[in-house]
Design a protein with these regions (language model features):
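TRNA-recognition modules of translation machinery and tRNA-sensing kinases, especially anticodon-binding
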Residues: 68-70, 101-280, 290, 386-492
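Extended, well-folded interaction surfaces typified by the phenylalanyl-tRNA synthetase beta subunit core
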Residues: 2-13, 19-37, 41-44, 48-102, ...
Length: 492
């Protein structure tokens, strides 16, 4: 779970009130957080939520707490300045790292707390939400050192030389990957391609080599920097825009002014970022009643939602009606009405719900499948294999194209939030191969297995599909062959 460092006085100034440690511990329940350590005025706060990157900095925590302790409720509103800066996107970068979004923050007064939180948020979001920069990487620059317009393109390994941040001399992209510490750490993200992403300004100076490193010239942000450029690159625009919005909001909460940026692709299509769009949503009042154990009044429902940073459009008068609401697009975690009701419960306070004894008791036991699975795991671990656990959601490319197989009929998601998670897996082998491909830098031999659920179409089933348990084993090494793998199966 993400753990962030926070200066208590900084948090109090952002919220607009003071806290004792006990009061703060209680208030952090609104963000699924708890104090993990105290050293003077420095706090370590653990956020027990891996799907709320907007809470992984002090500004995000303060944004939620302000809604509980002031009239500043509902979806936060941010004024934006119309764009002047343009980033042109070359066709060359499309197959390497296709998505980019950017924002300008003007007139920001940077102190030690802001600089510390900015760096921390950048690392937490890119590291966790961005899957160690694979899905999302963030660059923050001193705008006054950049000559517009910018070009996001791709270059060869011996392309434009530049001095990377904390570097000692100018280097080619290949040298950055071979010599610079960040280049060594993240080279695996780009070295499978014959060209590397790069951002160049109007003076033909390199601004950044995403997702690896910024340039020393414009990428060093200090307390003297007044105008910042934030750029986010990645594989899916939805994730890129979410990360950008979070950082832009955080700096706006510090007094900065948000200015949009034009993103122009090779076909002259223009996207303006950031945009603080909202989505409409409906929640059944019956679900609220069933979850709470009672039906809150319409006034209470509206108050709980606004304190949870939702806009309430309307509340139907009848108990079998709906609540019509809006939520910001950076809340990617909202996929079901229960996600909204959970926020309402946190705002109400779980401790305020009166417990009731169950009306009847039952005695449970392990299912036969669970007993079997435990035995299988014991056997596999006994052979020296390490168990892995991958997602049941995947995509057709992993299941078929990468396995050199024709497409087959499988269970697909009607409205996937990401093309990476658009189908249900029908077998486990691709998951093992994918993991091995991402761990080529780990010592060999590698022995892994997975025992997990798969899904196949079944027209005779009431839901049209059927779940089943499957197991797969894989071993990689210089002396591995089929005979060796067969002996593992004979362990049964």
């Amino acid at each position: 779970m993400p753990t962030i460092d926070v200066h208590k006085q900084d948090l109090e100034e952002l919220v607009g009130r003071k806290f004792t440690i006990e009061e703060l511990e209680e208030s952090l329940k609104f963000v699924k957080g708890e104090i993990d350590g105290v050293s003077g005025h420095e706090l370590k706060i653990e956020i027990k939520s891996t799907d709320r990157p907007d809470l992984w900095n002090v500004e995000g925590i303060a944004r939620v707490l302000r809604a509980h302790y002031s009239k500043n409720q509902g979806i936060p509103k941010y004024n934006v300045i119309k764009p002047e800066l343009t980033i042109n996107v070359s066709e060359k970068v499309k197959k390497v790292r296709p998505c980019i979004a950017a924002a300008i923050i003007r007139d920001i007064k940077i102190d030690d707390d802001i600089l510390k939180q900015l760096i921390q948020a950048q690392e937490k979001i890119a590291g966790t939400f961005g899957r160690r920069r694979r899905e999302v990487a963030i660059g923050i620059f001193n705008l006054d050192k950049i000559v517009p317009p910018l070009l996001y393109t791709a270059t060869k390994s011996d392309g434009l030389k530049f001095e990377p941040l904390d570097g000692e001399r100018k280097m080619t992209p290949a040298e950055v990957l071979e010599i610079h510490p960040k280049g060594k750490e993240f080279a695996h993200l780009v070295n499978s391609h014959d060209v590397y992403p790069i951002i160049i300004d109007g003076a033909n100076d390199v601004v950044s080599m995403p997702p690896i490193i910024n340039s020393e010239k414009s990428g060093r942000v200090t307390k003297r920097s007044k105008n910042l450029l934030i750029e986010v690159t990645g594989l899916e625009m939805r994730n890129v825009e979410t990360a950008l919005n979070i950082l832009a909001m955080s700096l706006a909460d510090r007094g900065g002014k948000i200015e949009q940026v034009n993103i122009v692709d090779s076909r002259d299509n223009i996207i303006v970022t950031p945009t603080f769009a909202v989505k409409d949503f409906k929640v059944d009042k019956y679900l609220i009643k069933r979850t709470f154990g009672f039906m809150p009044s319409d006034k209470e429902i509206k108050s709980l939602l606004e304190r949870s940073r939702y806009n309430v459009v309307s509340v139907d008068k009848t108990d079998d009606g709906h609540v019509h609401l809006q939520f910001p697009t950076y809340r990617q975690d909202i996929m079901h009405a229960m996600d909204v009701v959970e926020d309402m419960l946190m705002a109400y306070g779980f401790d305020n719900i009166e417990p009731h004894y169950p009306e009847f008791f039952t005695q449970g036991e392990l299912k036969p499948a669970t007993v079997r699975n435990r035995k299988l795991r014991e056997i596999m671990v006994g052979t020296g294999a390490q168990e892995i656990s991958t997602f049941i959601l995947t995509n057709k490319k992993n299941l078929f194209e990468k396995m050199n197989l024709p497409d087959d009929e499988i269970v697909e998601i009607a409205n996937p939030v990401s093309s990476n998670w658009s189908v249900m897996r029908s077998w486990l082998t691709p998951s093992l191969v994918e993991l091995l491909s991402k761990n080529t830098n780990v010592e060999y031999p590698q022995k892994i297995f997975e025992l997990g659920q798969c899904v196949k179409l079944n027209t005779r089933s009431q839901v049209g599909s059927e779940e089943m348990w499957k197991m797969a084993y894989s071993e990689a090494g210089s002396k591995v062959n089929f005979t060796h793998a067969k002996t593992i199966l004979q362990a049964y």
